[in-house]
Each structure stands twice: as C-alpha cells, then as structure tokens.
Amino acid sequence: MKKTQRKEIENVTNITGVRQIELWRRDDLQHPRLDEVAEEVPVALVYNGISHVVMMASPKDLEYFALGFSLSEGIIESPRDIFGMDVVPSCNGLEVQIELSSRRFMGLKERRRALAGRTGCGVCGVEQLNDIGKPVQPLPFTQTFDLNKLDDALRHLNDFQPVGRLTGCTHAAAWMLPSGELVGGHEDVGRHVALDKLLGRRSQEGESWQQGAVLVSSRASYEMVQKSAMCGVEILFAVSAATTLAVEVAERCNLTLVGFCKPGRATVYTHPQRLSN
C-alpha cells in the first residue's frame, strides 16, 4: 500500500484561525481534497516576565482572552490593574506579555501555579483539589429575563462563529440583551477561552453585566459558572447540559443557570426567580 503524507497548505482564507490542509473522505480514499481546519496554538500568559499559564486556543482576540482570564481567575479586579499588554510569537506558539500593577503581581506570586492545559482546561496544574474553587461573592438579583427572547438568540449564535461555520470546530460565547439580541460574541476552540474573550471584551469596554445574560454554545462546567460569577454575570445560558459541580457553584453564588437551551426548550437548574415566560 502506498504511503501518503499529510500535506499542509498555506492559509489562503481571510479568516484568522483557519488553515487549509489536504485530507481524504471516507467515500473517496484515493483522491485527497483541501478542506479548512481550525488552528489551535499554545498561548502563554506571561505576567511581569513570569509565565503563569499555557492554554490551547484559537490565535485571535488574545488580548481579550488575557484580560478576561485575568479577571475571571481573580488575578486582577479591574482592567486598570493591567498597565500594558503585547502579543508576541514564541518558539512553539504565542505569548501574551502582561504588565501587572505591583500590588496585583505580588498577589499573583503568592498563589502562582504552573499550568499547562489541554484545550480550554482550567483545572490542569492545580496542586490541590481545594485550590479549584475560588471565593465568589453572592450575586445580587437585579433583573428578570423573558425566556421567550431566547429562541431568536439561539438562531443567531453561529453568526459569531465564522471559523466554526467553516470547520465545525469552535465554541461561541455571546452577550444577550434582554431583547434577545446578541452582541459582542467570540469563538474559540476552547469553550473556557471563548468565554474569557467575551468577559475581557465587555470589561474593557466598561459594559454592565446587569442587563442581559451570557449564552454559550457548549455545556456548562463549574468553571464556566465560576468565571461568569467572578465578573458579575447573573444569568448563564448553555446549549448543552450542566454538571453537578456547576449547579452547586451556581446555587451557592446566586447565579441563574440554564441548560439544554434549544428553541422552545430550556432546563433551569438554579434561581428561576430571575426568569419569566
């Protein structure tokens, strides 16, 4: 049998994060064809010269990712704690070089962990199980959301996934206004990274978290809940299911968690008092 070698083609699309490669279909193994595949690269977040975490991510909107990660992990309290940021190539991927305030950097050094995650993984590298959970202040109850507005948002979620439409390989996170309109959506090969990009962008733009909800195309893990709550998000909608730990965290921090979101369908796990129908 003749050996074949996979051939990678120069990126000929206009979309960052997509590359064309040569591949074979099941019904025609004799003739290769070109198809689009989502890029996944190691991204190191380097604070004041010290590498803190390496995540696998899509190579775009990395400044938003770094800001959102810093906020949702409790490294900073506001975007003002970051004095500067640069994205630079490294030997095997990309580095986001972040200049923290002295006070925040001292706090980071006290709890620093070496983390090398798989795609969007935020638990890998934690030294003890007790370190997984982060203290989250209970959220206020400032709004109600009409579930009838959810259906239109679900139909438009993939508008924020240009890479996903080409490759079938990304998750999306978007902000949903009370009207059901989606604004400020982001995509990534990692669901946690997509959420961090959304959190970072809205925080940088000074947007309120109290008039609307986050909608994600993935399941709702405990970390998705925790990241949302750390930034003040009161309602999280997920297209897929929630885990038991996600439900426990949502209950504890007063976050309204909704899963299995499809047109005409939704499962409310916690705090339904924020919802109407």
Swiss-Prot record:
Subcellular location: Cytoplasm
Keyword Cytoplasm (UniProt): yes
Described function: Required for formate dehydrogenase (FDH) activity. Acts as a sulfur carrier protein that transfers sulfur from IscS to the molybdenum cofactor prior to its insertion into FDH.
Main location: cytoplasm
Gene: fdhD
UniProt keywords, alphabetically: Cytoplasm, Molybdenum cofactor biosynthesis
Binding site for Mo-bis(molybdopterin guanine dinucleotide): F260, C261, K262, P263, G264, R265
Coiled coil feature spans: none
Example GO BP: Mo-molybdopterin cofactor biosynthetic process
Annotated Gene Ontology cellular component terms: cytoplasm
InterPro entries: Cytidine_deaminase-like, FdhD
Pfam family, one: FdhD-NarQ
Iron-sulfur found in the keyword field: no
PANTHER family in alphabetical order: FORMATE DEHYDROGENASE (PTHR30592), SULFUR CARRIER PROTEIN FDHD (PTHR30592:SF1)
Active site positions: C121 (cysteine persulfide intermediate)
Recorded family membership: Belongs to the FdhD family.
GO molecular function: sulfur carrier activity; sulfurtransferase activity
Name of the protein: Sulfur carrier protein FdhD
Disulphide bridges, residue numbers: none
